[in-house]
Amino acid sequence: VNKLNFYDIDKEFFLSDELYEIIKIALDVSDKTNGVYDITVGSLVNNLGFGPNLFLDNQYVFESYSLKFSIDDKNKSISKYKDVVFDLSSVAKGYAVDAISDYLLANNFNNYLIDIGGEIAANGSSKNGVWTIGIQDPQSLQQNVSFTVTNSSKFIGVATSGDYLNFKYLDGELVSHSIDPRITKSKDNNVLSVTVLDESSVSRADAFATAFNIMSLDESVELSESLGIKVKIIYISDGLIKYFESKSWQNMNYE
């Protein structure tokens, strides 16, 4: 990714198979969220101190990625039109979990749980039965569990996005690592934590969890219901902790 970020404008950059797949997943989620999920926010992330001290002078503009770069599916390459800075941290961990899961299944390992930075794949069963995954209470300093999900002996991908583990104070103001590209700064909503379940892709769950963490609750409700996404959102309303569960989440047998 660093090579891509440093690469010249208007020159074709050839992607590895893995990087191509990651970017294609990300762009699909970007399309479905009207650009709220944006992998070109790298300069904003860096300027807020959540990334390296690179590309700090790059000016971010919220606009369609088609105005920033193009991807050639035949050659698996990218050509940048502008000095965009890619940040794939919101999908790369999920992709790594998927890759390990695929490897295990290909080698006939059918009972496993994989966890990379909170992005999880579970399949089959543990020695004690189904896998039970605890989702942290976003307001608990002791990492207490807010709720649990199980895989019911099937494959599930679980991704959780929140700001309770990655934030800082700048000039006395709480700053989140979750960037809303529409306002070019940390998100401004009442969402504390988002958990997405996907029955085939941790990568996709990872990206959508990030998007729902950035969007307003109303936006997330509308989008998750229209796409049939299994999502549970913890949020604050009138000073109280509340939960939203999409219809797809309510209808599953994993909780």
What kind of region is each of these model predictions?
Residues 1-255:
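Mature catalytic core of soluble alpha/beta enzymes
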